[in-house]
Amino acid sequence: MSGDSKVWAHASADTWAVQNGISTYDLDTSSIKREKRDHNEQFNDGYGPPPGSASADPASYIADPAAFYNLYTNMGGAPTSTPMMHHEMGEAMKRDKESIYAHPLYPLLVLLFEKCELATSTPRDTSRDGSTSSDVCSSASFKDDLNEFVRHTQENADKQYYVPNPQLDQIMLQSIQMLRFHLLELEKVHELCDNFCNRYVVCLKGKMPLDIVGDERASSSQPPMSPGSMGHLGHSSSPSMAGGATPMHYPPPYEPQSVPLPENAGVMGGHPMEGSSMAYSMAGMAAAAASSSSSSNQAGDHPLANGGTLHSTAGASQTLLPIAVSSPSTCSSGGLRQDSTPLSGETPMGHANGNSMDSISEAGDEFSVCGSNDDGRDSVLSDSANGSQNGKRKVPKVFSKEAITKFRAWLFHNLTHPYPSEEQKKQLAKETGLTILQVNNWFINARRRIVQPMIDQNNRAGRSGQMNVCKNRRRNRSEQSPGPSPDSGSDSGANYSPDPSSLAASTAMPYPAEFYMQRTMPYGGFPSFTNPAMPFMNPMMGFQVAPTVDALSQQWVDLSAPHE
């Protein structure tokens, strides 16, 4: 018996079968020795486990981990995991990782993997010289890297010693090929994305309606005048702008709102509307046309802010600067627009040309800006007696007194919820000859500049009685409205005034209780009281219940007023 046979002579057939997972027990010593020699010959390439180890091929463990456990344990009910098994598996994995790291193709694999990461995450920004950031991680640059790698390998060929491992070499080559394909796919995806973006931009430029942009640029082509170079209106006998006329005061070129405030809407002293109204009083217009040049120094003699020449009854002419105001629905550039339409002194202001003014507001709300532009929007009335050659009525630029009356009547009838529904907007637009957009803009401005000052004034006065308005609370269903429609034909709009002192007399409709404002603690000295329906409820929770009031005299109860 040889030396190898003596080594395994003391071990029985059962012990060898248990350790190696062999199910047969009639094995002799020679067969055991031959099988063990086969295991040793499998790892003679220098990368496997050392001779004498009982582990099998490490590549098979990855595909079938159970084979590794069955190699050391029996198929019976014994535990399938022991510390020795984990130690052996960790050692084998460590040797496999070291063999991969020491492979000559590993630096090329790392370089290609980094290129794929850069191609995925790097933005494709074009620099000034025309090169993009993707040139570093492009597929074409990999050829240069490959040539550099081959040159470096050939230079260091005599310094490196490598034992061939066909299985590991095949894995490395397949990994490099897979990453190479992935890099090509990433480059193709970026190319398709860039092509799509370019075609999309070209399509937008071809189909985008640029006529509106061109109109805005044409309207704002005049150079803006600095506010410091403008003073009061001077007297000049020349109708041109080149005369010695002193420019009048010019407000800021952009103002998003054009509805007059209730505080200065009724001023008749001739002072110009300052602040955000962007309009001038027309009370001293005739006096400015007929008076001498000394009257132009007074602030009350400012005429209408309109371009062109104003002719007086005495024959004297004065040159007006072209003043235009940008509204939210007109031009967004906020520039100046020069109009040359003369406005006669004998012409009533109700029949003034709409093209010569953009923002006009008279004391008492006789006129108000529509919020329309020269873009050809038509009103809701498709045909009318005053229609143009196209059969459609031209949208007026200035609100008439009747339109203002209807709007104000509806607003003060529905102060608790000043949001008209779509049907009511259509009805108001049909009655006034305006567009729905103009009606909507008027109510937006009115809620901010008429209703909100009333609320602020009541809050400053320390009383919250009649003015309890639902602020910023829209209906879920726009078809319903808490107030009546102005199509009833009532002339009650003339009785309404934005003055809060006369509001109680002019608004007889009771207001509903705003329970949503009473969710937490009472405010403004309002005493808390318990809910009779739920006496044990925390007073800090839920809604409060109003005290008993005569139902015939007042249907709704306002909880914002102090109670005894």
Swiss-Prot record:
SUPFAM superfamilies: Homeodomain-like (SSF46689). One of its GO terms (biological process) is animal organ morphogenesis. It is found in: Nucleus. It comes from the Eukaryota. Residues 40-59, 216-270, 293-313, 328-397, 455-503 are annotated as: Disordered. Forms a heterodimer with homeobox ceh-60. One of its GO terms (cellular component) is chromatin. Disruption phenotype: Worms exhibit severe posterior disorganization during embryogenesis (Nob phenotype). Mutants exhibit Q cell migration defects, affecting cell position along the anterior posterior axis. RNAi mediated knockdown abolishes nuclear localization of ceh-60. RNAi mediated knockdown targeted to the intestine represses expression of vitellogenin genes; further repressed on ceh-60 mutant background. This is Homeobox protein unc-62. InterPro entries: HD, Homeodomain-like_sf, KN_HD, PKNOX/Meis_N, TALE_homeobox. It comes from Caenorhabditis elegans.
